Amino acid sequence: MTTPVSPTSLLPLSAEQLTRLQAATGDFSSTQLAWLSGYFWGLIQQPGNVQPGATIDAATTASAVTVPVQTITLISASQTGNARRVAEQLRDDLLAAKLPVNLVNAGDYKFKQIGQEKLLLIVASTQGEGEPAEEAVALHKFLLSKKAPELKDTAFAVFGLGDTSYEFFSKAGKDFDGRLAELGAERLLDRVDADVDYQALAAQWRRQLVDILQARVPVQGNAVAQLAAQGALDEITSSPYSKSSPLQATFAVNQKVTGRGSEKDVRHIEIDLGDSGLRYQPGDALGVWFDNDPALVQELLELLWLKGDESVSVDGKALPLSQALKSHFELTQNTAPIVEKYAALSRNETLLSLLADKPALQQFAQRTPLVDMVRQAPVELTAEQLLGLLRPLTPRLYSIASSQAEAESEVHITVGVVRYEYEGRARAGGASSYLADRLSEDDEIRVFIEHNDNFRLPANSETPVIMIGPGTGIAPFRAFMQQRDADGAEGKNWLFFGNPHFTEDFLYQVEWQRYVKEGLLTHIDLAWSRDQAHKIYVQDKLREKGAEVWRWIQDGAHLYVCGDANRMAKDVERALLDVIVEHGGMDSEQADEFLSDLRLERRYQRDVY
């Protein structure tokens, strides 16, 4: 006769511990339970977390450490955080469905293992004029090269994020999707290309994908939690403040840092975070929610014969039309889809003629403010028709120009105010003019931190640093230097900065001169493009100092570039390649490979926009 064994006697918990655990997790969802299991697994992997004398029975842990054969690899290729959020939501959906998934940033993905992937999901954003997210550049380059392997045993799906105000909308997503298919991979689901209002499309895509994968992949048990551990550990330090739940901070300082004669209006902005506990690191960005200019709202309403007091529904809430336009919809960015929809409503011949010529349509949208398009082709619309044209308001991201080692409960940003004229009428950027013109000291401002682990100072404070940041691209390097100063970092620092004029546009001049005097800033090279007959830019200074730049690289220097993605960043990269060819003794192909290796080693990082 065999005596039955109580199930609880097999557990490494006492009855009291089991009761407490059940009470604590009784109201947890399946996703939360999976997250918690992964969190605990991650804890025991950390050195020192197994108590002396404690034993772990192999029989009780075997299932937790067995990696399933068909693991879903989910790659997040994010520039501003949106792709990362979609990927995290998909991961949570898959975990809730008990499907094994490994979420990895594109910058951390060992892309040469792609030939072994069975199930591959990519959420990819596009930056600038069709470029992949900075963290995905190496993966994108590898996949589109001759080195990419056949993927006949791989099934995949791609979700692309972009902005229809740019010509090459969602190009990175299209590139990944098309190339994976070319390499023989099976498409699980048609690619989705989402605009800035991506949430509904993303939710639908996630639901469809989970259904497809549930029919294809065996449901797993504890292995899911083990695979989720990496993501779980990342989330325990997350802030309660986010894009959807921003901090109500205090607007503290608005100081113009360009001279009276400058063609540019650049502001140093300081925001008081109070006792919120909101934390950030050098390299992070500040997300800023803003309101449109009431004068612009009124101008648009009058052109469309609307009063502004019409009741409309926004996210299920009734609002006056004027308030909805002020706080919930983009008014300072025109796009080709908006022009197309407005042409259909207005039946304006000039606008309709653009529809057959995509380049002309895109150019018109980029050059013509929305309100001026309406002025050129006025038509009487209902409030609902107007809102149906517009995109939801999105926050703007600014590279943080301070370190909390110095600024403590403040966050600083450097804002180039967008101002221009269109047919004799003054126009301005939505967020930049909000910060420069419409906020007063002590006003509330809604902000959040967008973390950027792809733009970080070296872990070793003795490592040399080369910083290349013309214009407002200097912002994160102010944060870098504050941090290096506070850390007593012994590594050398070299700044390349450029702007039109020395006397009018030398941003934070006194601070840089102090760092030079104190010896913290080893070198500073300045390029003033309009102070002489021939224009000089930072890329020219890089070539001029190429021999020493190469010596620094050979000594392990980390390279950082911040600023304009469309021209400056490309020109700087060409200059760096020229330096590597000339002083490194390589041909162009070898130089390109060398720079790619620096990127993979996190020694070449860019924050471009």
From Swiss-Prot:
InterPro entries: CysJ, CysJ-like_FAD-binding, CysJ_Proteobact, FAD-bd_FR_type, Flavdoxin-like, Flavodoxin/NO_synth, Flavoprot_Pyr_Nucl_cyt_Rdtase, Flavoprotein-like_sf
Domain Flavodoxin-like: 72-210
Pathway(s): Sulfur metabolism; hydrogen sulfide biosynthesis; hydrogen sulfide from sulfite (NADPH route): step 1/1
SUPFAM superfamilies named in the record: Ferredoxin reductase-like, C-terminal NADP-linked domain (SSF52343), Flavoproteins (SSF52218), Riboflavin synthase domain-like (SSF63380)
Domain (FAD-binding FR-type) ranges: 244-458
Annotated Gene3D superfamilies: 3.40.50.360, NADPH-cytochrome p450 Reductase, Chain A, domain 3, Nucleotide-binding domain of ferredoxin-NADP reductase (FNR) module, Translation factors
Entry cofactors: FAD; FMN
Domain of life: Bacteria
Record text on cofactor binding: Binds 1 FAD per subunit.
Keywords tagged on the record: Amino-acid biosynthesis, Cysteine biosynthesis, Electron transport, FAD, Flavoprotein, FMN, NADP, Oxidoreductase, Transport
GO cellular component: cytosol
Biological process annotations from GO: cysteine biosynthetic process; hydrogen sulfide biosynthetic process; sulfate assimilation
Family of the protein in this entry: Belongs to the NADPH-dependent sulphite reductase flavoprotein subunit CysJ family.
Reported function: Component of the sulfite reductase complex that catalyzes the 6-electron reduction of sulfite to sulfide. This is one of several activities required for the biosynthesis of L-cysteine from sulfate. The flavoprotein component catalyzes the electron flow from NADPH -> FAD -> FMN to the hemoprotein component.
Record protein name field: Sulfite reductase [NADPH] flavoprotein alpha-component
Native source species: Pectobacterium atrosepticum (strain SCRI 1043 / ATCC BAA-672)
Gene coding for it: cysJ
